[in-house]
Structure formats: structure tokens, C-alpha cells
């Protein structure tokens, strides 16, 4: 597919690429940040973001009626909706987690529509441009395939990637290497796809800026890593110790299922004590290794989670998520 050409425009489109250590946080970059998330973390400020708006999948909850037939919104409309909301520090999507081929089209369409919208309203939105961060499929044993998928995602122009279902330190190291160009000691190929166009810079400039923070304190890519299994919890300290993770997350939703059983009536019962212990286990590893810790908060628990030490939050798109961000920003002095 031929590369698209856009007018030079600095768009802070983000994919989870990052590494956090004490030095990186204490010594911020000497240059203005394109990636707002990294800038906030460097100054130890709480970070709040939302899943970007998307069309319904067409699947209702178990036992619930199917969603009503509604004409899907075109990418341009979804992008304008996202950019009209100014309180988010990042936009997030999990569309690629279930498979690159299935999710690539909608993500690519949204990124392109975002760039188009920014270019049409440059003076209004440029200073508030917000990074895009996306999940990628589980790294797993096929490291070559994982590296290819990571490169493909980065070439969209995102600024951050989330590694899902992480269960070992080696898995993280392989993923982080795939986020860095070979010239930086990584395994990412020299191909940059459409990323330079989305970032509004030349190919050479993109390669200079698109490196992993905080391994490179001037890098603009950030990595998020999520632990969401008993195997991952067993190795969470080894995972947290890997240099290059920008934010470590407990997979709260998935872990709720991990610590659930089915009773005699066929109902799912959550062991809330074990679930909370798992969350605190990840948080303790974050604190031990000075890695920011993330959580998918709601209005009911964001103040508590902030007091516990979580500092990066992602909420669902919509009024409930916006209310949660309002509470979080007030609590965090932002």
C-alpha cells in the first residue's frame, strides 16, 4: 500500500512505548514534549485518558437483548468527537488485541481521520493534540511474529503500545526491543510506514524521536505492560524490574474473572479479597521498582486508587468516564 502524504503537522499520536526508572522521572527531557503522557509522568503528575469513541460491536451482554440497529458513525465523526473532548491526556484502544488483521482497519481509519481533523482545525487543536495508545496482541512464544505486529502497529503513527497478558520478563524485553529501531539497539526494521506523516516530520526526524522512554529520556514512545494472570502475578517483580516499561498495570477486569468461581446455582462469584490482593501485588511491584502504575478506574474508586498510589487511569468513553476524569483531575490538583 503506498504511503499517504500529509501536510507537516506535529500530531501527538501515541503507542505504548516507554520505560520508567528513577533517573527518567527525576531528570525530565530538556526539550518540549510531543507526548503529553510522558511529560506528565516526568513531572509526577497523574494521567487520565479514555477509550476513543467507536461504533458498537453488535454484541450485547450475555442474556441482554442485542443493541438496536444504529447506523455506524464514519471515522471522521468519531475523530471529531474525540478531539472535541479536551480533558483526556490520551486516547486508548484495545481493537488490535484480538488480532492485527481484524482490528487494523478501524484503528488505521481512526488515526487517519484524526490527522485530517487536526489539519483542518490546526490552530484550535494542535496545542492540545493527544497521544493514541493501543493494545497489541499477546507477544507469546513466536517472537518474530510479535515483532512484526509491534512494528506494524507503530507504523500507524501511534505513540504508545500496551503489551497484554504478560507473564515473564523475557517476554517484555522482546517486546521492548521490537519497539526500538535497530540503530538504537532494538529489532524494529527501518520501515516507518505512515508514522512520520502522522507525526508531521521527516523520516529521519521520526527515527530520532520515536525511541523508547525512559531508556532514552528524549524518546517519545511509551510502553504499557499489563499483568492479568496468576502466572504473570507470580513473576510480577521480575517483570516490573525490566528497564523500559513506562506504566505497569494490573488487568483488573481480567483478574476479576481469574479469581471467580461458579457456585451451585451456576452463578459467577468473585473472590473479592483475592482479586484486590492481586491488584495490590502489582502496585507493590510498581512502587518497589519506581514504575508508574495504571488502573481502569470509575467515579466510585478513582480517589481511593489515587491515594493507594496509582497514577495513570483509563476510562470508558462517555459521561461516566468524563465524570471520573473530572474527579481525578480535581483530586490530583489538575
Put a short name on every predicted segment.
Residues 1-10:
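Bacterial N-terminal signal peptides that target proteins for export
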Residues 25-334:
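Expand to "…catalyze enediolate/carbanion chemistry for C-C bond making/breaking, isomerization
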